Amino acid sequence: SQATNKPKFKIPEGFANAVAKVSLVIAKELQKDCVLTTNREEFVVSGTGGLGTAETKFDTDHMTLSKVSVICSPEHLTKVLADVTHLIVDKNSVQMHGERLTYYVATRG
């Protein structure tokens, strides 16, 4: 399994709410409904539509995130990026190609 090779990040108190808030902002900017599902081990926030996807997943002890990729107008990209900058673990992971913004949301342990 490739899962064991993914980096793990400690989740600080309040981080789950921060990620949820940011993901909701992304979904709102994409003008798509946002779906939140929770269980004891995992918290998932996702906004999906024809314009792109924004998905965040992590468990209660460690965090492993998939790539977040969204397509929206330049002004919306600026707003989204401003909202998530403090949560992006690797600033070099942020890429913009036309109207597509790709980044990884995480926090340093």
Task: Report each predicted region and the residues it spans.
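DNA polymerase processivity clamps
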Residues: 2-109
